[in-house]
């Protein structure tokens, strides 16, 4: 029983460490989300061009099924 508890605690600590390491750094977080459309999900170039038109560096389709146009910071 004691060994089982130690294994469970070890697994929980490993999960916590991996979840913390998987969090994106502040510089990797998307800075501007635009409502759905602007080419997503089928035309990522249209999203990129939209973001360029609003004076952002570029953009990409993000989300579960890539329906949200997300723009890069300047």
Swiss-Prot record:
Q: Which Gene3D superfamilies match?
A: Knottin, scorpion toxin-like
Q: Which SUPFAM superfamilies match?
A: Scorpion toxin-like
- Disulfide bonding pattern of the chain: 40-61, 47-69, 51-71
Q: Does the keyword Transmembrane helix apply?
A: no
Tissue expression, as annotated, is: Hemolymph.
Q: Name one GO cellular component term.
A: extracellular region
- Has keyword Signal? yes
Q: Which UniProt keywords apply?
A: Antibiotic, Antimicrobial, Cleavage on pair of basic residues, Defensin, Disulfide bond, Secreted, Signal
| Principal localisation | secreted
Q: Which InterPro entries match?
A: Defensin_invertebrate/fungal, Scorpion_toxin-like_sf
Source domain of life: Eukaryota
Pfam family example for this protein? Defensin_2
Tell me where the signal peptide lies: 1-22
Which GO biological process categories is it annotated with?
defense response to Gram-negative bacterium; defense response to Gram-positive bacterium
Q: Where in the cell is it found?
A: Secreted
Residues that make up the propeptide removed upon maturation = 23-36
Entry's PROSITE patterns?
INVERT_DEFENSINS
Role description: Antibacterial activity against Gram-positive and Gram-negative bacteria.
Q: Which family does it belong to?
A: Belongs to the invertebrate defensin family. Type 2 subfamily.
> What is the designated name of this protein?
Defensin
Q: Which gene encodes it?
A: VSNA1
């Amino acid at each position: 029983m004691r060994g089982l508890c130690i294994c469970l605690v070890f697994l929980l600590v490993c999960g916590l460490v991996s979840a913390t390491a998987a969090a994106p750094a502040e510089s990797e977080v998307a800075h501007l989300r635009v409502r759905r459309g602007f080419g997503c999900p089928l035309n990522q170039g249209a999203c990129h061009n939209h973001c360029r038109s609003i004076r952002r560096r570029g953009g990409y389709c993000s989300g579960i099924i890539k329906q949200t146009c997300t723009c890069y910071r300047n």
